[in-house]
């Protein structure tokens, strides 16, 4: 399959998943904090850590699978630009500390999620 088409299919699925999670989070958790962006960034970090660890250590993801899942799906599912603008808006609307909580939370929890994803991939492989 054409590599551009693989990226486009993955991106369409990732963007729709991101949108649905954003709507769900806004309805369920409220609009006082960018919960949707936080959730997709953490989940995306976890899945990326899992896929890249499993894909390089055991499964050997094909170039096509990486284009579809990593570049396409996760590239459109997670977002840095929304995170930056939402952090700026939080600073303006709710103060510096709320904004810093968002910045620190996305970075620290995202990193932790990537580490946990990698650990899960190793566990799935039987490598502990």
Each model region followed by its residue ranges:
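Membrane-interface helix-loop junctions in multi-pass transporters/channels
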Residues: 1-128
């Amino acid at each position: 399959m054409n590599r551009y088409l693989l990226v486009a299919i993955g991106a369409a699925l990732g963007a729709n998943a991101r949108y649905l999670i954003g709507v769900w989070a806004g309805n369920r958790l409220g609009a006082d904090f960018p919960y949707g962006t936080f959730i997709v960034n953490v989940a995306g970090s976890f899945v990326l850590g899992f896929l890249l660890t499993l894909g390089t250590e055991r499964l050997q993801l094909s170039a096509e699978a990486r284009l579809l899942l990593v570049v396409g799906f996760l590239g459109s599912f997670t977002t840095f630009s929304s995170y930056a603008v939402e952090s700026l808006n939080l600073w303006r609307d709710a103060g510096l500390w709320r904004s810093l909580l968002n910045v620190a939370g996305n970075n620290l929890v995202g990193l932790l999620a990537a580490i946990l994803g990698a650990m899960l991939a190793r566990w799935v492989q039987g490598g502990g």
